[in-house]
């Protein structure tokens, strides 16, 4: 008989298909990413979302780096339960670790701006006219007694050269030019070096020169009595200068340099000391009022001619208290000559009025009066405030020749302290007095120019 078919052995089916072994990692939170990964990546744990890291939390243990470390069996309590912060939907290059404002190498400090070299773009050049206060060597080639091209003059000038400046060093024109920001040393127009055709001398010519002549005055007879360059001849040199400039830079640029440059004039002291009170003996023919009016008219005429030659920025410096210079004190027993000082103040007062009238009359002009009288008066009244120890005697030994005003030649004894003297010789300030007075002068009037 047929064997009863044995019951098939129970299928090993009851074994449910091997459920995926429970992942040691907590169930993956639904990722807010737009594309959820369809299947777990080789790593059983989802790649840990990069921590935003704005503030690195004190992660327990080594902060798990997002990367292929396939065995993160450590159940880190932090990363998973933390609901992924909304800001990191698609790992926007997590503000690349907001480059902590730290190692942003602080930008190297720009080199400290070096002081501007003398070359003022607003005032491209300076032109000086007048007497010894501005003369930088124009008298050297003249047949005149009024020369200072010998020692001890210039003993404090660079290289100790006696250039013909009426001082132990620099003079007013040098300091005015320096404080206007143009250049530190102003050449004399007739200096032979300026006649050379090299580039250096030509650039020196472009930034201005001095036409002044020691001993000159507003009145022609003052200059003629000393055989020096008259104010009218200085204007002739100015015309010649313009011709040379046109050859160098052309007509248009020459016109600009002359009109934008500062033309500065100082005269009057020699008219009063020598022509009125001295050998000229004009005080016998004219009273001081009419003589100073004549001087002021001559000054106005000079300014008008300067304007006619293209100058538009014109400064006219008054007369200082010349009655207090060493050579003029002698006659009054070391006391200031008040007659001279009165005449100087009278002339200055007329100069202020006439320059004011010209300033209103001449279109596109800037005409400024420079009050040097009050600046020097303060230095005479309180010398210790400026570091001067001697205001009545000159620093150098005066010779009897040359009007009893100039230093004897080759006398260098006891002159190492020239800066403590207000006056260098019988009439002219020391280099230090020039420096202080002209710094104050420029500071006071620069905004007008």
From Swiss-Prot:
Disulfide bonds: none annotated. Pfam families: Lipase_GDSL (PF00657). GO terms for molecular function: lipase activity. Residues 1-118 have a biased composition (Pro residues). InterPro entries: GDSL, GDSL_lipolytic_enzyme, Lipase_GDSL_AS, SGNH_hydro_sf, SGNH_plant_lipase-like. The active site is at 132 (nucleophile), 425, 428. Coiled coil: none annotated. Found in anther, only in male fertile plants. Residues 1-123 are annotated as: Disordered. SUPFAM superfamilies: SGNH hydrolase. It comes from the Eukaryota. Belongs to the 'GDSL' lipolytic enzyme family. PANTHER family: ANTHER-SPECIFIC PROLINE-RICH PROTEIN APG, GDSL ESTERASE/LIPASE EXL3. This is Anther-specific proline-rich protein APG. It comes from Brassica napus.
């Amino acid at each position: 008989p047929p064997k009863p078919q044995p019951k098939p052995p129970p299928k090993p089916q009851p074994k449910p298909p091997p459920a995926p072994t429970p992942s040691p990692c907590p169930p993956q939170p639904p990722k807010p990413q737009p594309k959820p990964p369809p299947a777990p990546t080789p790593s059983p744990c989802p790649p840990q979302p990069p921590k935003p890291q704005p503030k690195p939390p004190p992660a327990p243990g080594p902060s798990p780096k997002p990367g292929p470390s396939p065995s993160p069996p450590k159940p880190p309590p932090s990363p998973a339960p933390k609901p992924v912060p909304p800001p990191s939907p698609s790992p926007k290059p997590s503000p690349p670790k907001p480059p902590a404002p730290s190692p942003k190498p602080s930008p190297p400090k720009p080199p400290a701006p070096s002081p501007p070299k003398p070359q003022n773009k607003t005032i491209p050049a300076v032109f000086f006219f007048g007497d010894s206060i501005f003369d930088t060597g124009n008298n050297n080639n003249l047949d005149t007694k009024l020369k200072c091209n010998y020692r001890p003059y210039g003993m404090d000038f660079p290289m100790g050269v006696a250039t013909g400046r009426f001082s132990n060093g620099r003079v007013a024109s040098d300091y005015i030019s320096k404080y206007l920001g143009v250049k530190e040393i102003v050449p004399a127009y007739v200096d032979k070096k300026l006649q050379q055709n090299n580039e250096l001398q030509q650039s020196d010519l472009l930034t201005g020169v001095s036409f002044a002549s020691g001993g000159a005055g507003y009145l022609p007879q003052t200059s003629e009595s000393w055989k020096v360059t008259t104010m009218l001849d200085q204007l002739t040199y100015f015309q010649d200068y313009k011709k040379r400039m046109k050859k160098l830079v052309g007509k248009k640029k020459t016109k600009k340099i002359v009109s934008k440059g500062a033309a500065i004039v100082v005269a009057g002291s020699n008219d009063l000391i020598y022509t009125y009170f001295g050998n000229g003996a004009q005080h016998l023919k004219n009273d001081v009022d009419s003589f100073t009016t004549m001087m002021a008219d001559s000054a106005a005429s000079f300014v008008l001619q300067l304007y006619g030659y293209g100058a538009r920025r014109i400064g006219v410096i008054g007369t200082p208290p010349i009655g207090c210079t060493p050579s003029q004190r002698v006659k009054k027993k070391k006391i200031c000559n008040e007659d001279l000082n009165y005449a100087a103040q009278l002339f200055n007062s007329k100069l202020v009025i006439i320059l004011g009238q010209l300033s209103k009359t001449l279109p596109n002009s800037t005409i400024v009066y420079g009050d040097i009288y009050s600046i020097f008066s303060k230095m005479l009244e309180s010398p210790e405030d400026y570091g001067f120890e001697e205001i009545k005697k000159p620093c150098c030994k005066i010779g009897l020749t040359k009007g009893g005003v100039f230093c004897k030649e080759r006398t260098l004894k006891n002159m190492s302290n020239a800066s403590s003297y207000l006056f260098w010789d019988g009439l002219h300030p020391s280099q230090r007095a020039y420096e202080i007075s002209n710094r104050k002068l420029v500071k006071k009037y620069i905004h007008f120019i």
